[in-house]
UniProtKB/Swiss-Prot annotation:
CDD domains linked: IlGF_insulin_like (cd04367)
Protein family (similarity comment): Belongs to the insulin family.
Protein role: May be involved in the transport of sugars to the developing embryo in the fruit. May also be involved in signaling events.
Tissue distribution: Expressed in seed coats and pods.
GO CC entries: extracellular space
Pfam families according to UniProt: Insulin (PF00049)
Lineage: Eukaryota, Viridiplantae, Streptophyta, Embryophyta, Tracheophyta
Biological process according to GO: glucose homeostasis; glucose metabolic process; positive regulation of protein secretion
PANTHER family: INSULIN, INSULIN/INSULIN GROWTH FACTOR
The species this protein was found in: Vigna unguiculata
Name of the molecule in the record: Insulin-like protein
Annotated keywords: Carbohydrate metabolism, Glucose metabolism, Sugar transport, Transport
Amino acid sequence: FVNQHLXGSHLVEALYLVXGERGFFYTPKAGIVEQXXASVXSLYQLENYXN
Protein backbone atom coordinates (compact mmCIF):
# COMPACT_ATOMS: atom_id res chain seq x y z
CA PHE A 1 0.00 0.00 0.00
CA VAL A 2 1.62 3.23 -1.12
CA ASN A 3 0.61 6.82 -0.43
CA GLN A 4 -2.09 7.76 -2.91
CA HIS A 5 -5.12 9.92 -3.59
CA LEU A 6 -8.17 8.28 -2.05
CA UNK A 7 -11.77 9.38 -2.51
CA GLY A 8 -15.20 7.81 -2.34
CA SER A 9 -15.36 4.06 -1.94
CA HIS A 10 -11.57 3.75 -2.19
CA LEU A 11 -11.22 6.02 0.85
CA VAL A 12 -13.76 3.96 2.80
CA GLU A 13 -12.00 0.70 1.85
CA ALA A 14 -8.65 2.09 2.98
CA LEU A 15 -10.13 3.24 6.30
CA TYR A 16 -11.60 -0.22 6.92
CA LEU A 17 -8.23 -1.77 6.09
CA VAL A 18 -6.26 0.55 8.36
CA UNK A 19 -8.70 0.82 11.27
CA GLY A 20 -9.90 -2.80 11.32
CA GLU A 21 -12.21 -3.75 14.19
CA ARG A 22 -11.71 -0.35 15.82
CA GLY A 23 -13.81 1.14 13.06
CA PHE A 24 -13.46 4.76 12.03
CA PHE A 25 -15.29 8.02 12.37
CA TYR A 26 -16.23 10.66 9.86
CA THR A 27 -17.08 14.25 10.60
CA PRO A 28 -17.37 16.71 7.73
CA LYS A 29 -15.25 19.30 9.53
CA ALA A 30 -12.40 16.84 10.14
CA GLY A 31 -11.03 17.38 6.63
CA ILE A 32 -10.76 13.71 5.66
CA VAL A 33 -11.89 14.41 2.09
CA GLU A 34 -9.44 17.28 1.67
CA GLN A 35 -6.64 15.29 3.28
CA UNK A 36 -7.18 12.00 1.44
CA UNK A 37 -8.95 12.83 -1.82
CA ALA A 38 -7.37 16.15 -2.74
CA SER A 39 -3.83 15.20 -1.78
CA VAL A 40 -1.78 12.07 -1.21
CA UNK A 41 -2.56 10.33 2.10
CA SER A 42 -0.38 7.95 4.08
CA LEU A 43 -1.45 4.98 6.19
CA TYR A 44 -0.51 7.01 9.27
CA GLN A 45 -2.86 9.82 8.21
CA LEU A 46 -5.70 7.34 7.63
CA GLU A 47 -5.07 5.71 10.99
CA ASN A 48 -5.80 9.06 12.66
CA TYR A 49 -9.45 8.50 11.71
CA UNK A 50 -9.70 5.08 13.37
CA ASN A 51 -11.66 4.92 16.65
